[in-house]
């Protein structure tokens, strides 16, 4: 469950390290986002010579949450932290690599590129 002001780590090689959620997209009164949801973020910490810099405002898709996601068989997939992958305006990933595991719930048409870049799909 990600809401405004939540700090997340970045799971790609775009150059950002830590980002903060500034808006949950998908409705005017929407408060929480989960795995697979698109959020608006601002970059709080970035590496030098990266593709993005501190202060940039971008979109991101959530790929891991501490809250986890419930599967239809009743199992819950949880992670140690909250992580996202940065997107450009066309909702394509900015980075060319994705670090860490990604859940199967991201397997919708929009994010198949992220699934193909991921080293492990749970």
UniProtKB/Swiss-Prot annotation:
Lineage: superkingdom: Bacteria
Signal peptide: none
Record-linked PROSITE patterns: RIBOSOMAL_L14 (PS00049)
Gene Ontology biological-process entries: translation
GO cellular component, one term: cytosolic large ribosomal subunit
GO molecular function: large ribosomal subunit rRNA binding; structural constituent of ribosome
InterPro entries hit by this protein: Ribosomal_uL14 (IPR000218), Ribosomal_uL14_bac-type (IPR005745), Ribosomal_uL14_CS (IPR019972), Ribosomal_uL14_sf (IPR036853)
One Pfam family recorded for the sequence: Ribosomal_L14
SUPFAM superfamilies: Ribosomal protein L14
Keywords annotated in UniProt: Ribonucleoprotein, Ribosomal protein, RNA-binding, rRNA-binding
Function recorded in the entry: Binds to 23S rRNA. Forms part of two intersubunit bridges in the 70S ribosome.
Complex and partners: Part of the 50S ribosomal subunit. Forms a cluster with proteins L3 and L19. In the 70S ribosome, L14 and L19 interact and together make contacts with the 16S rRNA in bridges B5 and B8.
Family that this chain belongs to: Belongs to the universal ribosomal protein uL14 family.
Protein's name according to its UniProt entry: Large ribosomal subunit protein uL14
Organism: Baumannia cicadellinicola subsp. Homalodisca coagulata
Taxonomic path: Bacteria, Pseudomonadati, Pseudomonadota, Gammaproteobacteria, Candidatus Palibaumannia
